[in-house]
């Protein structure tokens, strides 16, 4: 077997301090241990087939760690084993953290979700929408937006703002304006990115459709403007420290840099190789952006790196309706609002976007095991999470591959659910 198994007793003890026993009903595991072992064999096979270099999987139920194992390698060439405390680029799993930050400011009365973004970032006043463009992708005419972008539009990706790496009518415009996806080792700061973005047209009128885009990056700048702190300091002071998250950063301190997992690419499904940042739709000027370069960009949409265990602490706060250490990071009603489905993202109503993640509305056409009301999201470099309020369950899967041709993350989730008694 390739898997590197690590003890999870110490994290379990910590979880008891973070989420006191009285916050959960008396606990009796709902899992079949023999069925859980199927995960080990599946991940070993994915590694042997060179689909992924390695992975860390974590399952927590009722605040107790059920499963926390590492497999394969953090760096294949040096045969550096994957460990439970390996640090991964979590990319869009950053978005849920940013959404929590916005909701914290909402609860402080510093903003309304119906507020126009221009109230905090004046450059967004008078946004325009694409009207026509030519066959070369050049926009030839725009019109005034029917209304301004609101905070809620950013939270639900219904603002009309796109992503450079997702093909759209804005692709050429974003390229010419040098709009980035938020990940860089260059000397670019969040303010410059957002002010530049505000000058670009929208794909559609705010609130009228859905397009995944740089919305959480804009929200990150709103947090900076309202809190008077950089997004980095706000996250550390207001979220990570209260949750005891000691391994989650935009840029890793020197004593933790060696734990960053190497990024791989599987261009054509024939096996992984070390990524140079140019193989996928997301261009990286440096795949090692969490440790190299200027370290000036704080992307609220994609910038964080973390461990499976650290991120599980954040997810447990969501599952426990904002409660942590007998205090409320957020109120129960705010968490309820965040996990309320708002905009259909898969055309059949099964998945709707909440405030930072997809929410499962029904299972009528589902091909995966899940629960109605569960919510989930993932990152571009093959990390994913889900929270299941019905089963009092969270799952985290982390690897580092893009492009990826593996089904390991989906299989991990299905194998977790098939292990429930």
Region roles according to the model:
Residues 11-21:
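Bacterial N-terminal signal peptides
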Residues 23-25:
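Boundary at the C-terminal end of the N-terminal hydrophobic targeting segment
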Residues 37, 43, 63, 89-120, ...:
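Active-site SXXK
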Residues 2-10:
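Bacterial N-terminal signal peptides that target proteins for export
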């Amino acid at each position: 077997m390739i898997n590197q198994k690590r003890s999870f007793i110490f994290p379990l003890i910590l979880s008891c301090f973070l989420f006191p026993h009285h916050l959960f009903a008396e606990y009796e595991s709902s899992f079949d241990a023999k069925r859980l072992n199927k995960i080990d064999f599946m991940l070993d096979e994915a590694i042997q087939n060179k689909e992924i270099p390695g992975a860390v999987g974590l399952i927590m139920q009722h605040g107790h760690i059920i499963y926390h194992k590492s497999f394969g390698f953090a760096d294949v060439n040096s045969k550096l084993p994957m460990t439970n405390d390996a640090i991964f680029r979590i990319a869009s799993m950053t978005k849920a953290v940013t959404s929590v930050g916005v909701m914290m400011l909402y609860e402080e009365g510093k903003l309304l979700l119906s507020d126009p973004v221009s109230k905090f970032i004046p450059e967004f006043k008078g946004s325009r929408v694409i009207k026509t463009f030519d066959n070369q992708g050049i926009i030839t005419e725009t019109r005034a937006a029917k209304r301004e972008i609101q905070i809620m539009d950013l939270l639900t990706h219904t603002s009309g703002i796109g992503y450079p790496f997702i093909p759209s009518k804005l692709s050429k415009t974003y390229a010419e304006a040098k709009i980035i996806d938020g990940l860089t080792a260059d000397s670019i700061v969040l303010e410059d990115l957002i002010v530049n973005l505000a000058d670009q047209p929208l794909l559609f009128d705010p609130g009228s459709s859905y397009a995944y885009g740089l919305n959480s990056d804009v929200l990150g700048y709103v947090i900076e403007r309202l809190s008077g702190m950089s997004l980095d300091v706000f996250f550390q002071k207001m979220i990570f420290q209260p949750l005891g998250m000691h391994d989650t950063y935009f840029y890793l301190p020197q004593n933790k840099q060696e734990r960053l997992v190497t990024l791989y690419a599987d261009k054509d499904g024939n096996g992984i190789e070390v990524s140079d940042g140019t193989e996928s739709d997301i261009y990286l000027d440096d795949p090692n952006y969490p440790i190299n370069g200027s370290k000036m960009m704080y992307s609220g949409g994609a910038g964080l790196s973390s461990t499976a265990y650290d991120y599980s602490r954040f997810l447990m706060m969501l599952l426990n309706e904002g409660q942590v250490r007998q205090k409320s990071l957020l109120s129960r009603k705010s968490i309820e609002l965040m996990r309320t489905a708002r905009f259909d993202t898969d055309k059949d109503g099964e998945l709707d976007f909440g405030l930072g993640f997809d929410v499962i509305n029904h299972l009528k056409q589902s091909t995966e095991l899940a629960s109605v009301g569960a919510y989930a999201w993932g990152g571009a470099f093959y990390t994913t999470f889900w929270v299941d309020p019905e089963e009092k369950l969270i799952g985290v899967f982390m690897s580092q591959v893009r492009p990826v041709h593996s089904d390991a993350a989906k299989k991990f989730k299905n194998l977790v659910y098939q292990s429930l008694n």
